Amino acid sequence: MAKKNKARLLVKLLSTAGTGFFYVRSRPKAAPKLAFIKYDPKIHKRVLFEESKMK
């Protein structure tokens, strides 16, 4: 079995439109917080997704 890479984190990208829709991505631990403009299917628009805590 392969070893997991400990230098990366799984992060949740939550929609700033307030719909509750999210994407899960991985990023290096040393990198700054992620923010992307991606498609939110609940409102049928592209909106900003910002990193939030995974539960």
Curated annotation (Swiss-Prot):
A biological-process GO annotation: mitochondrial translation
Domain of life of the source: Eukaryota
A single GO cellular-component term on record: mitochondrial large ribosomal subunit
Main location: mitochondrion
Subcellular location: Mitochondrion
Keyword Protease: no
GO molecular function: structural constituent of ribosome
Short name of any one Pfam family annotated for the protein: Ribosomal_L33
SUPFAM superfamilies noted in UniProt: Zn-binding ribosomal proteins
Keywords for the protein's UniProt record, in alphabetical order: Mitochondrion, Ribonucleoprotein, Ribosomal protein
Record-linked InterPro entries: Ribosomal_bL33, Ribosomal_bL33_sf, Ribosomal_zn-bd
NCBIfam families listed in its UniProt record: rpmG_bact (TIGR01023)
Subunit structure: Component of the mitochondrial large ribosomal subunit (mt-LSU). Mature yeast 74S mitochondrial ribosomes consist of a small (37S) and a large (54S) subunit. The 37S small subunit contains a 15S ribosomal RNA (15S mt-rRNA) and at least 32 different proteins. The 54S large subunit contains a 21S rRNA (21S mt-rRNA) and at least 45 different proteins. bL33m stabilizes the tRNA acceptor stem in the E-site.
Family listed: Belongs to the bacterial ribosomal protein bL33 family.
Function in brief: Component of the mitochondrial ribosome (mitoribosome), a dedicated translation machinery responsible for the synthesis of mitochondrial genome-encoded proteins, including at least some of the essential transmembrane subunits of the mitochondrial respiratory chain. The mitoribosomes are attached to the mitochondrial inner membrane and translation products are cotranslationally integrated into the membrane.
Protein name stated in the entry: Large ribosomal subunit protein bL33m
Species: Schizosaccharomyces pombe (strain 972 / ATCC 24843)
